[in-house]
Amino acid sequence: MMEIKHYESQEIIKVNYFWLRDHCRCLLCYNTETLQRKYNLLDIPRDIAPEKGGFKYLKDGKVLQVKWTDGHISDYDVDFIFSLQVEKFQSNKAKSTLKTPWNLPIVLQNERHIRFKLTDLIASDAVVKDYVSALIRYGIVFIDEVPASTAMTEMAIRRVFPVMKTFFGEMFTFTDAADHADTAYSKVYLGSHTDNTYFCDAAGVQALHCLSHVDGDGGDNFFVDGLHCALELKRRNPKAYDILTKVQVPAEYIEKGQHHTHSAPMIRVDPVTQEIIQMRLNVYDRAVFNTIPQSEMMEFYNSFCEFLEIVQSPESQWRFKLHPGTVVVFDNWRVYHGRYAYTGKRTMTGCYVQRTDYQSKARVLGIID
């Protein structure tokens, strides 16, 4: 281990020799055009260490130069080394205020921040950044004044994100016709859920647009912030929260030519920062539950039911009717959505966006790290 002192704060950290050698950014080790390492990790001796007296500070302590026992010389930016430590990473995540958990009163107070006109979105890159920032913060945004067609809905989404292709297609248009083995393809009540719980990598973002609803009524949509609900469960019952972050809940989708299955917790947390990174809930797609012993079942079901009480409470649910001309875009890893039963003929269109594309856009715009 090497002790490194910060030139301003005088803080001292200890870093592993091999890790330090692995993070050399000289032109022999790092391709500055592709931003990729250039060497085989096995090229570094396992017992790598600085030569005796082989390190010194340059440029008033801002640069650390190390002469290694394999003959390599590395110059390190001291701020760079300090910024890469796990404690710094955890601290930055803990202090992050990018996301605003919401219930009904909070989201209604902030609705003006999450509505965007299609013409403004097309005309201004600054509006695109505001749109993605709002989606990161609240998990839901609206694009207004979109002509009611699948083609125009696709254009509105592709202005910012590429569209994800699944067995539903890229853009999907649906009614109550049973085109797929899914409750969404019906007129019945559809409770709060996330899509694709049966995929190994569920869509990160979903978009929906009601193209028409004639000769009937009902069909109000509703949205629930799963992040708020999870934090509320953690406050009320930390043990129940812990159970839902650990128990693997199986999901399954079966129709002719398709059989998808995946198991994961209902609340997924980052193992390093403990930050909530994905909410996963779909009572319709739950498969046979065989991932924990029977002796633990009741404790899980009690936790599950307590969580559902929060999710289904009136204060958590934002209910409204989608009309032609408004596209709702929401974070499928955070926000639950559902629909009340309806009569008549209702036509919806929509699509998915991969999580990695969503986050890539946010990084390119400088919104997240």
Task: Tell where the protein language model's regions lie, with residue ranges.
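Motif-centric detector for short Cys/His coordination patterns
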Residues: M1-A123
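Active-site environment of non-heme Fe oxygenases that use a 2-His-1-carboxylate facial triad
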Residues: K99-I140, E145-V329, W333-D369
